[in-house]
UniProtKB/Swiss-Prot annotation:
UniProt: ATP binding residues: G169, D170, R171, Q172, C173, G174, K175, T176
Catalytic reaction annotation: ATP + H2O + 4 H(+)(in) = ADP + phosphate + 5 H(+)(out)
Protein name according to UniProt: ATP synthase subunit alpha
Site residues, Required for activity: S373
Subunit structure: F-type ATPases have 2 components, CF(1) - the catalytic core - and CF(0) - the membrane proton channel. CF(1) has five subunits: alpha(3), beta(3), gamma(1), delta(1), epsilon(1). CF(0) has three main subunits: a(1), b(2) and c(9-12). The alpha and beta chains form an alternating ring which encloses part of the gamma chain. CF(1) is attached to CF(0) by a central stalk formed by the gamma and epsilon chains, while a peripheral stalk is formed by the delta and b chains.
HAMAP family per the UniProt record, alphabetical: ATP_synth_alpha_bact
GO cellular component: plasma membrane; proton-transporting ATP synthase complex
Native source organism of the sequence: Burkholderia cenocepacia (strain ATCC BAA-245 / DSM 16553 / LMG 16656 / NCTC 13227 / J2315 / CF5610) (Burkholderia cepacia (strain J2315))
Role summary: Produces ATP from ADP in the presence of a proton gradient across the membrane. The alpha chain is a regulatory subunit.
Family, per entry: Belongs to the ATPase alpha/beta chains family.
Pfam families: ATP-synt_ab, ATP-synt_ab_C, ATP-synt_ab_N
Membrane topology summary: Peripheral membrane protein
């Protein structure tokens, strides 16, 4: 087969006309050094702070340092295959994570990739990991409670929806246990929970997930895990990723609860990244913006108004306010709350629950120090019945701790002081609670009522908890209607108070405890 010159030229013309050429203009640079997950890149002139960068082998990084002649970036994932001279491209995108109800019940990493072996997360939406917190105009005051089911917290340090309440204490004194009880108690309360594990052992995270599954809490919980074996970048990003996932529900008129366990590890990871990026160190070798690291995260937890939700959803959701409640955890060293990170987070949050190793070792669990634990806004959110009954408990405990210190040195105590000490011992005993056994509102109300009205005063201290349990069981079987009224109204009317008094007196006479 022979082609003449005219046919060849026609063929070439038709090929040229059919050619679709599109110019792919992308900013790219060259890797000049890789150390400890930090990459220095030359030639990336048009790059944003926090922009995703594409490395060879489908690996991504995050631009953090924008200098005159180079860019400092942190690698998200493995970096062993990246070497000097590799080409780096900009993506034009800020880091995003998947959001939506599809994530509920799943365990994901800091980038939203599933790590629970249950297949892909088919989330329809993604959202930026760094967002501006809602302004003052769009916020509402805290007025609805988050019931943790823990007697000492719900009575003395109440938490409201949209609040930031710090859980602070030394290692191994029950911080995670308090947070998990709060999640387990949200069953049937229309509250989505997000548990962010930062820098923990993989086995510890697995134990948490297993416990949440056993109690049925994974049905409304998302777990974001950046374990100790993950890179510092992943530990730094995990809280922001979890917060973005929680904001999805807040902005659509729903309520969410997020637990950061713990922010000390995030601060350590950020310090490591900053020092490797050659940023100037400050107090305790932390960078200058470590306060901003936590403030911009915790300010995103808020109760937003109906107008905000309506504007955000373009009128699809009306008349509903949303909230994101944050329970950050901070680990102290030898009870030192004056260290840099603890003082920062105490000043950002709306109160703190202070756990003490001495109380924990003395068998008072949860080991909450009632004297220094405080909730600055939660009182407005307390249920009526608990608010009525809890005032006396806090006073009794505070006076007991003060008197107990003096009583060690005094041999002859007057009757009033002795009475106060005895009451305090019983209240302290009453506030003990086993792990993973959160209480309902009526159960807390009954316990507080019994303590306030002196029904525990003539009991032996060792009998207090068995009396409380027996009383609850008795009310469940004989006074179900009274329980229902307290649960429905969240209040104790005059008639109900009379019925409760009679029930307690009858039970006490029976001696069935």
């Amino acid at each position: 087969m022979q082609l003449n010159p005219s046919e060849i030229s026609e063929l070439i013309k038709s090929r040229i006309q059919g050619l679709e050429a599109s110019a792919d203009v992308r900013n790219q640079g060259t890797v000049i050094s890789v150390t400890d997950g930090i990459v220095r890149i030359h030639g990336l002139s048009d790059v944003m702070q926090g922009e995703m960068l594409e490395f060879p082998g489908n690996t991504f990084g995050l631009a953090l340092n924008l200098e005159r002649d180079s860019v400092g970036a942190v690698i998200l994932g493995e970096y062993e295959h990246i070497s000097e001279g590799d080409i780096v491209k900009t993506t034009g995108r800020i880091l995003e994570v998947p959001v939506g109800p599809e994530l509920v019940g799943r365990v994901v990493d800091a980038l939203g990739n599933p790590i629970d072996g249950k297949g892909p997360v088919n989330a329809k939406l993604t959202d930026a990991i760094e967002k501006i917190a809602p302004g003052v105009i769009w916020r509402k005051s805290v007025s609805q409670p988050v019931q943790t089911g823990i007697k000492s917290i719900d009575a003395m340090v109440p938490i409201g929806r949209g609040q930031r309440e710090l859980i602070i204490g030394d290692r191994q004194c029950g911080k995670t246990a308090v947070a998990l009880d709060a999640i387990i108690n949200q069953k049937g309360k229309d509250l989505i929970c997000i548990y962010v594990a930062i820098g923990q052992k993989a086995s510890s995270i697995m134990n948490v997930v297993r416990k949440l599954e056993e109690t049925g809490a994974m049905e409304y919980t998302i777990v974001v895990a950046a374990s100790a074996s993950d890179s510092a970048a992943m530990q730094y990003l995990a809280p922001y990723a979890g917060c973005t996932m929680g904001e999805y529900f807040r902005d659509r008129g729903q309520d969410a609860l997020i637990i950061y366990d713990d922010l000390t590890k995030q601060a350590w990871a950020y310090r490591q990244i900053s020092l490797l990026l050659r940023r100037p160190p400050g107090r305790e070798a932390y960078p200058g913006d470590v306060f901003y690291l936590h403030s911009r995260l915790l300010e995103r937890a808020a109760r937003v108004s109906e107008e905000y939700v309506e504007k955000f959803t373009n009128g699809e959701v009306k008349g509903k306010s949303g909230s994101l409640t944050a329970l950050p955890v901070i680990e102290t060293q030898a009870g030192d709350v004056t260290a840099f990170v603890p003082t920062n987070v105490i000043s950002i949050t709306d109160g703190q629950i202070f756990l003490e190793t001495d109380l924990f070792n003395a068998g008072i669990r949860p080991a909450i120090n009632a004297g220094v634990s405080v909730s600055r806004v939660g009182g407005a959110a307390q249920t009526k019945v608990v608010k009525k009954l809890s005032g006396g408990i806090r006073t009794d405990l505070a006076q007991y701790r003060e008197l107990a210190a003096f009583a060690q040195f005094a041999s002859d105590l007057d009757e009033a002081t002795r009475k106060q000490l005895e009451r305090g011992r019983r209240v302290t005993e009453l506030l003990k609670q086993p792990q993973y056994q959160p209480l309902q509102v009526w159960e807390l109300a009954v316990s507080l009522y019994a303590a306030n009205n002196g029904y525990l005063d003539d009991l032996d201290v060792k009998q207090v908890l068995s009396f409380e349990k027996g009383l609850r069981d008795n009310l469940k079987t004989s006074h179900a209607d009274l329980i229902k009224r307290i649960e429905d109204t969240k209040d104790l009317s005059k008639d109900d108070e009379g019925a409760l008094r009679s029930a307690i007196e009858a039970f006490k006479k029976s001696g069935a405890y």
